[in-house]
Amino acid sequence: MREPALAASAMAYHPFHAPRPADFPMSAFLAAAQPSFFPALALPPGALGKPLPDPGLAGAAAAAAAAAAAAEAGLHVSALGPHPPAAHLRSLKSLEPEDEVEDDPKVTLEAKELWDQFHKLGTEMVITKSGRRMFPPFKVRVSGLDKKAKYILLMDIVAADDCRYKFHNSRWMVAGKADPEMPKRMYIHPDSPATGEQWMAKPVAFHKLKLTNNISDKHGFTILNSMHKYQPRFHIVRANDILKLPYSTFRTYVFPETDFIAVTAYQNDKITQLKIDNNPFAKGFRDTGNGRREKRKQLTLPTLRLYEEHCKPERDGAESDASSCDPPPAREPPPSPSAAPSPLRLHRARAEEKPGAADSDPEPERTGEERSAAPLGRSPSRDASPARLTEPERSRERRSPERCSKEPTEGGGDGPFSLRSLEKERPEARRKDEGRKDVGEGKEPSLAPLVVQTDSASPLGAGHLPGLAFSSHLHGQQFFGPLGAGQPLFLHPGQFAMGPGAFSAMGMGHLLASVAGGSGSSGGAGPGTAAGLDAGGLGPAASAASTAAPFPFHLSQHMLASQGIPMPTFGGLFPYPYTYMAAAAAAASALPATSAAAAAAAAAGSLSRSPFLGSARPRLRFSPYQIPVTIPPSTSLLTTGLAAEGSKGGNSREPSPLPELALRKVGGPSRGALSPSGSAKEAASELQSIQRLVSGLESQRALSPGRESPK
């Protein structure tokens, strides 16, 4: 039988009787496991092996024998309170020689009224595997200590009885015998040892003590069994070194109102409400705030579900018995609904988060000079003053797809392939372009452009890549951003999840099919060119003064293959199938710059005469086989991102759409010595013929509106 503690006195001072003789062995302080020793007795080394009888189980004779054994060991026996002299053994002096210190410690419990409220309802303390602090925290105020002597203050938690409890019908009741006890651990106050003056200056708080149910805990937390009742104890030891604890005098203080039942979740709703009302850190149970209960109610929203994933509860916050979580990190705005999910990584540059780059609202009031949007990674100060740039500087600026969709050939107005001069000659092309929804005047992309990551700095010149736009099937969404030095370039995977009809008319600039060679102008494409072909056809050359090395060929083979994008040998983005207008651009991809436009025009003309391709419903029969073309390093290519269709294989179902003119130019020598005036006239006439072809095709499409392109 456990001897009951005395009734609470005015100072709530009780020498606590330990339930077993070997409650705290000396190894509790010398080993990491922290076992136990007998708190009311200071034993010499020779007496550690002697068994101490339990006074609660022994009779008067056993108690007298224990007193005699202690006397043989050289200890003084003193009686405290009305208990029998053998019931509470106390050493007046430690074995270590110390000066006589006159002290009479008195201990009072802080927040006693709050403890009384919990005690009336049955205090519960939550225990977790990671450790949970107590609330109310165990705080005491000590007085009567010697100001100069040093003291060690510590506490432990022992089983109040040998019963297991359950909460039934709104009350706690005994449910059986207690489970085996967990290892005993003492919690030494972190400020120990300290002088009596320091201890008496302020309340002594053990708020950092944590309770756990993890038997293999390595952090020194107090290990408890769930649904068992426990009693905290407070000890004062006069010693100047923690190593002297086993040989020092312990004064133990017990406050009956601090007993509690360890639980893994609160059982009594009244206890829960009392903790909410008094614990400022109990946000996990409030209906208002950032607690778990509130978030559980609102988790139907996907944004809050994402917030829950990134905001893991910090269950052991300062003086907290409930979970608390860090504030949510700054999150990017949600992506556009048109962006399809994909296993490919989508990286948006920081510049796209700025209003000037990410805002997709139309801005018709902006002039052409202001439409030179900031390339990725440029400072706002440079973007804010486009008027300061001279004409050559503007031609070397890396332009965004928004700029290119409006003026794809800025900086090339004086060249032979000037778009503006051709549109003046062809007013019907301007009217047609204005009526188109996907590349209308002032139309800006509804999705911020994405970029592709290269292994090294991009070798493109300032005007090498004007941009890339898709057909009306994609509703004018921009596909690529300008390739800047060191800027990532990733392909939007949502565009690849479409049927072949989505790519019925697609214009790509000098993108992935460039052949490394000498200096020369690089080709471009844009939806506003005269060779508009439903998605922008072949664009004129960019600034001829650009002498930077062309785009590396290994990008198309290695980088895109690593991302799961199919890539043909010669270059290009979509091997096959593609629709009827692709062959005109593909034919030009294998020709020198001086004859590319003529070949494209002739190929397009043959396509219009083809019985299969001239119909309103285009066929998807193209041979994927390609014939390599030998190109001298001195020539540059006016390329598109499509696979080269220079000639058809022997097993192709269709005749070759490339006329003799194009074949003669391919087989002939490089015509690098043509006069600029002759090449300009030839290119202008060929582009005009392509324009007439497009007008005829669109008229055929208008005559059969019910026919749709194959999906």
Curated annotation (Swiss-Prot):
<dbReference type="GO" id="GO:0042826">
    <property type="term" value="F:histone deacetylase binding"/>
</dbReference>
<dbReference type="GO" id="GO:0005667">
    <property type="term" value="C:transcription regulator complex"/>
</dbReference>
<dbReference type="GO" id="GO:0071549">
    <property type="term" value="P:cellular response to dexamethasone stimulus"/>
</dbReference>
<dbReference type="GO" id="GO:0008543">
    <property type="term" value="P:fibroblast growth factor receptor signaling pathway"/>
</dbReference>
<dbReference type="GO" id="GO:0003148">
    <property type="term" value="P:outflow tract septum morphogenesis"/>
</dbReference>
<dbReference type="GO" id="GO:0007521">
    <property type="term" value="P:muscle cell fate determination"/>
</dbReference>
<feature type="region of interest" description="Disordered">
    <location>
        <begin position="640"/>
        <end position="687"/>
    </location>
</feature>
<dbReference type="GO" id="GO:0060045">
    <property type="term" value="P:positive regulation of cardiac muscle cell proliferation"/>
</dbReference>
<feature type="region of interest" description="Repression domain 1 (RD1)">
    <location>
        <begin position="518"/>
        <end position="602"/>
    </location>
</feature>
<feature type="compositionally biased region" description="Basic and acidic residues">
    <location>
        <begin position="363"/>
        <end position="372"/>
    </location>
</feature>
<dbReference type="GO" id="GO:1901211">
    <property type="term" value="P:negative regulation of cardiac chamber formation"/>
</dbReference>
<dbReference type="GO" id="GO:0022008">
    <property type="term" value="P:neurogenesis"/>
</dbReference>
<dbReference type="GO" id="GO:0090103">
    <property type="term" value="P:cochlea morphogenesis"/>
</dbReference>
<keyword id="KW-0597">Phosphoprotein</keyword>
<feature type="region of interest" description="Disordered">
    <location>
        <begin position="313"/>
        <end position="449"/>
    </location>
</feature>
<feature type="modified residue" description="Phosphoserine">
    <location>
        <position position="342"/>
    </location>
</feature>
<feature type="modified residue" description="Phosphoserine">
    <location>
        <position position="652"/>
    </location>
</feature>
<dbReference type="GO" id="GO:0048596">
    <property type="term" value="P:embryonic camera-type eye morphogenesis"/>
</dbReference>
<keyword id="KW-0804">Transcription</keyword>
<dbReference type="GO" id="GO:0042733">
    <property type="term" value="P:embryonic digit morphogenesis"/>
</dbReference>
<dbReference type="GO" id="GO:0003007">
    <property type="term" value="P:heart morphogenesis"/>
</dbReference>
<dbReference type="GO" id="GO:1901208">
    <property type="term" value="P:negative regulation of heart looping"/>
</dbReference>
<dbReference type="GO" id="GO:0006915">
    <property type="term" value="P:apoptotic process"/>
</dbReference>
<dbReference type="GO" id="GO:0032526">
    <property type="term" value="P:response to retinoic acid"/>
</dbReference>
<dbReference type="GO" id="GO:0000122">
    <property type="term" value="P:negative regulation of transcription by RNA polymerase II"/>
</dbReference>
<dbReference type="GO" id="GO:0006357">
    <property type="term" value="P:regulation of transcription by RNA polymerase II"/>
</dbReference>
<dbReference type="InterPro" id="IPR036960">
    <property type="entry name" value="T-box_sf"/>
</dbReference>
<dbReference type="InterPro" id="IPR046360">
    <property type="entry name" value="T-box_DNA-bd"/>
</dbReference>
<dbReference type="GO" id="GO:1902808">
    <property type="term" value="P:positive regulation of cell cycle G1/S phase transition"/>
</dbReference>
<feature type="compositionally biased region" description="Basic and acidic residues">
    <location>
        <begin position="390"/>
        <end position="409"/>
    </location>
</feature>
<dbReference type="GO" id="GO:0060560">
    <property type="term" value="P:developmental growth involved in morphogenesis"/>
</dbReference>
<feature type="modified residue" description="Phosphoserine">
    <location>
        <position position="623"/>
    </location>
</feature>
<dbReference type="GO" id="GO:0003677">
    <property type="term" value="F:DNA binding"/>
</dbReference>
<feature type="modified residue" description="Phosphoserine">
    <location>
        <position position="336"/>
    </location>
</feature>
<dbReference type="GO" id="GO:0001947">
    <property type="term" value="P:heart looping"/>
</dbReference>
<keyword id="KW-0217">Developmental protein</keyword>
<dbReference type="InterPro" id="IPR022582">
    <property type="entry name" value="TBX2/3_TAD"/>
</dbReference>
<feature type="compositionally biased region" description="Pro residues">
    <location>
        <begin position="326"/>
        <end position="340"/>
    </location>
</feature>
<dbReference type="GO" id="GO:0048738">
    <property type="term" value="P:cardiac muscle tissue development"/>
</dbReference>
<dbReference type="GO" id="GO:0003151">
    <property type="term" value="P:outflow tract morphogenesis"/>
</dbReference>
<feature type="modified residue" description="Phosphoserine">
    <location>
        <position position="675"/>
    </location>
</feature>
<dbReference type="GO" id="GO:0005634">
    <property type="term" value="C:nucleus"/>
</dbReference>
